[in-house]
Regions:
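PP2C/PPM-type serine/threonine phosphatase catalytic domain
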Residues: 1-163
Length: 165
């Protein structure tokens, strides 16, 4: 049986632009997604909710996790674009996403933007997804150190997001 909890924090924003979905699949599988609407663009909460809803609806009845995440994110992108047009918000409604799908044999990860997935072993971070952000690219080019990403002046400059592909 899968046990989980979720929590988000809107920080100093007036609206919480985070959305989370956790969906059991089959006997031992599950998938989860966290979306963080891009602040400053407007309607980030709508964007993150739209992507989570698409993900949730696609997973219902799915038992095959292999290949699920890329298809789900492409469908979420298409739904988000339709929603932008419907709401006349084509320059708004952007979100990051990080998703995990697990079956009885493997774990699959997909992400876009600066929402991260960490893998821990014995209470230590073994690895994490790499951000699609300006400071992450600077760190990869060795222009700044990895520990400087968090406080970098452009830490909120996301290079990729859903709609920004």
């Amino acid at each position: 049986m899968l046990e989980y909890s979720t929590i988000t924090n809107k920080g100093d924003r007036s609206v919480n632009e985070d959305s989370i979905a956790v969906i059991p699949s089959g006997k031992s599988g599950f998938a989860c997604i966290l979306c963080d609407g891009l602040g400053g663009h407007g309607m980030g909460d709508v964007a993150s909710g739209c992507v989570c809803d698409t993900f949730r609806n696609m997973l219902l009845g799915t038992t095959e996790m292999s290949g699920f995440l890329p298809v789900a994110l492409r469908c979420a992108q298409a739904n988000l674009m339709r929603e932008q047009i419907r709401l006349n918000a084509t320059t708004k409604m952007k979100t990051t996403a990080v998703a995990l799908a697990v079956d009885d044999k493997k774990a699959y990860v997909a992400h876009i933007g600066d929402s991260r997935l960490y893998i821990f072993r014995k209470n230590k971070v073994m690895t994490r997804t790499l951000d699609h952000s300006v400071p992450q690219m600077l760190a990869l080019c060795r222009e700044i150190r990895e520990d400087e990403i968090r406080n970098h002046p452009e830490r909120s400059s996301v290079l990729l997001s859903l709609i920004h592909i």
